[in-house]
Amino acid sequence: MVQLDDALQDAYKKVEREESLILGAKAMVASTKNPEVKRRLESNIAVSENNIKYLRERIDALKVESGSERESQSDKDSSKKYSDSAKSTNSDDHLLSYNRSAFDLFNSEKPLSPEKISTMLQHLQMRLSIEQQCVSGIEKIMSLYSKEQKDKTDVIIKLKEGKQKVNLLKRSLKRYNELHIPFDISTPSSEEKQQASGLNFRGLAKPISGTLKVTIHSLRNIEHTSFLQTHSFTMPSYAVLYVDDAQVAKSRISQTDTWDETFIFDVHRAKEFQIIIYEKKKDFDIPIALILIPTTIIAEELRRKRNIQEMSETSWKPSIAESASRSDEKGSKSDPINAPNSSSSISTNSPLAPTAYYKLLSKSWLSLEPVGQICISLSFSKRTTKRQFPETGLGRQGAIRQKKEDVVASQVGHQFVQRQFYQIMRCAVCAELFSYSPGLQCENCSFVCHKKCVTKVLASCIAQSNSEKSDFGGLRYRIPHRFEPFNSLGAQWCAHCGFFLPLRRKDCFKCVECGITCHGQCAHLIPDYCGMSNDLKHQLLTELEVSKRPKKPELPNQENKTTNEKVYRKPLSSQNTFDTLPTISQGLLAATQPVTSVLNTSPLPKTPEKDRSLNVTPSSSTPTPASVLAPPSSASLSSSKDANRSVPESPRREKKNRVTLDDFTFLAVLGKGNFGKVMLAEYKVNKKFYAIKVLKKEAILKNEELESLKTEKHVFEVANKEKHPFLLNLFASFQTSTRVYFVMEYILGGDLMVHIQRQQFSVKRARFYGAEVCLALKYFHENGIAYRDLKLDNILLCPDGHIRIADYGLCKENMLLGNTTSTFCGTPEFMAPEILLEQQYSKDVDWWAFGVLMYQMLLGQSPFKGEDEEEIFDAILSDEPLFPINMPADAVSLLRGLLTRDPNQRLGSGPKDANEVMAHPFFASIVWDDLYNKLYEPSYKPLINDPRDLNNFDEEFTSACPTLTPVNTVLTRQQQECFRGFSSFATE
């Protein structure tokens, strides 16, 4: 690793070089009479001056880092002031970087930065490796057309064009390398700040589909081949547009580098957009400049500008409203329920920020490689399906859960799953590159290889125990690698995980003996085979395996026959080995043995009824049923025998221990989600109403949701344990041959989504609901439960005006302090950044969702908007929420604390958990014990005329017919065994 003093010395040398270039260019300007040469030299002088400015800024930063420079007292004060303000809240960094994006990497009018230089070096290095492989392939093709002159001429032209592109990319890399200082100013959050600023290529090649509109206006400072010639006129040029290396448009030929031409074309799963400038020649046209932009960055930039446009049209700002009156703050502290100015919504004097899609065309000067700029206008309309929510306000969104990936192969402990990679990867076995294509990755240690190379994998997985680790077939070759840190300035890939090694990384290592490179965290996973190629290793091991293979014993009376068999017997091939690898059903056998054993079991005979109740005896630990759910009388059973008859029960079984589908009459559909639906039902025994959640067994088994079902039932038991006032309680659960049922208390007021769509909540009302939700989350977290699906749809409003949290389908248990998980699940608008980044996360994701919930209740819209899930995810990872200028400061402070991307800095993330949120000034005067005991009088109570009145529920659901759809699938006995013990009853 380059030391600080070496980095400073290198920076000084680069400044001296740029100054020398300026002096030489000025001398040439004074001596030449060619106007084209003068223009080009003046442009070079401006570029060098800009480079010197950047290098001096880097030198100052390095000096501050080393402490070698003594600043003046005024500089210290200003620097300390900035540092203190930055430490006061980490959201300030996000606010300063709100107008920065990955598109700035290509904008020639944006200043240079270390992030831009390092990222462009990586981007160009990867592109250079592709072009070099293309040139190598063209050279091989040219040898095939040695006898066909016409085809050979075309190949020669392509070869020259490819070599010219390689030269252009090498010149660009040289230019950025001359500005790159190989020293990373190590701060604890340097990578996080870079990610927060948007100056990174997250999801570089994520494909997008839609309509792209490009207008090419003009060029400037382009370097024509006539630059060194005596004549003053420039050669004609034209632009060619490519999408994923396929030509989609071509401009006319221009002598003045001006076009003003517009091109509109559809793209399907496009990854990269290119513009190449060609100069017209007699023999063949020469590429003189190019620009390569990932299509995702174009779509993201237009979405970001749309949000900026919304800010300019409204009085919303991405910062705290410093002008908020202190009277509001004092009022909120005196009485949070009846505070002055809190009876009306915040948006009364401030219009809601528009959410309609805004098609924006903007002129931008983008940097060409290696020199020059191009002025273009871009517009992109994403191809989307039906909108997920209305143009304004809020709408319902279903939760999502990522299904477990299929294990397609197992080798020496690795559990390989198929992954689609959208960048250039390198196989850790054969060392060949593959891009934009699927490969295999170990879900435990991230080892990457081709599917064809899986049988050649020799390195054991780190998840494998020492007793199970392979001894590499007895190959006694143990020479460890000599890894040393190095600066990755070229195209380098990790020898284990196959990813491209980023530039300016402090944890990149290279073996000084054999030259392989890897990440620091991957070095200990590489086997000790320094100096030996993988092909040689595999060949040696194959020969050892053949030599150690036991010979088949020969029978005395079949000597000749056995001899002939040995002559024609073939060795075991790698293909046969791959074919015998376990399938997904075999790989998951241990986890779901009763389910997967269906293959060896004959199905049960099909019954003529739609649903038959199963006689499931509650376990010994199941409480006795409550009186409210007493079993129906014989008269009741006889009156309902014509509707849905139960399976005849053994006389020895007591009927009081059963509740069946025949005991309920379904009246209406109350809700529907991705995992089931909820219906209103009347219990025939006592004529009381209950909400019954219905789930299909087939879907549970197919989606591997059996553990989630058990967790949901256990969370109901936790909620019932103390009869928490703000959690939905369970009264019973039962099952039929095709479905499982949760019998829950019926909340007549509907959910908050219906009420907020009818009327915007006031600050008083939002604070009241938020405080009760906070107590519910506190109870969950104290019991080690992460809720993970907090949203308005899952908060029910009781007739007395208090709330209940429902739907425990995404809950995660054993989430006490320090425990984490990585399941990708939740509702898109409420998912925390760490979930989207597929990182390990804790129960702190609930506080991010709580921040989104409070934002929606206070302002009537979501803080992160988008046309589809991908745009919403991009907004969560890069955008800053907007606040009206009249919003109280304590409310903004609460939202900013909750909507902090760093989970370690998020409000509520510490060991105090909910107590930290409850202590915030926004809830300062709430007496939490009184709130828990429902001593506060709610400001709003839903209007309920009759228990059958469905006016407080969404008409989209209530208009549906309350029937159970037929299920034709018949589950086996082993599959039914998976649901043993599900039926239970609650206690009073």
From Swiss-Prot:
It catalyses: L-seryl-[protein] + ATP = O-phospho-L-seryl-[protein] + ADP + H(+); L-threonyl-[protein] + ATP = O-phospho-L-threonyl-[protein] + ADP + H(+). One of its GO terms (cellular component) is mitotic actomyosin contractile ring. SUPFAM superfamilies: C2 domain (Calcium/lipid-binding domain, CaLB), Cysteine-rich domain, HR1 repeat, Protein kinase-like (PK-like). A zinc finger (Phorbol-ester/DAG-type) spans 413-461, 480-530. Its EC number is 2.7.11.13. InterPro entries: AGC-kinase_C, C1-like_sf, C2_dom, C2_domain_sf, HR1_rho-bd, HR1_rpt_sf, Kinase-like_dom_sf, PE/DAG-bd. One of its GO terms (molecular function) is protein serine/threonine kinase activity. This is Protein kinase C-like 1. It comes from Schizosaccharomyces pombe (strain 972 / ATCC 24843).
